[in-house]
């Protein structure tokens, strides 16, 4: 594994942990409802952008929750910048990860 790839993996894990913490304890957006968990974070090699994959459970309106996350991305980014020491704090792009929901659906069928 190249040195840069190992660093990317470490930063991805730190981003995942920190964004999870912010979503759990600090985010106060009324649109973000249900249980939102970060399943994966993937930062670009230039550290300018990070795709954050989230799974949303127990939410009546997944679209509204995703909209709330996108609206709050600036706040989340600022909190990440305070707690993770990076030269460039990446712009956060939230994507819905429905693999957990899909897995639960398959389990119920079996």
Question: Residue locations for each model-derived region?
Answer:
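Charge-rich, low-complexity N-terminal segments
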Residues: 1-49, 55-110
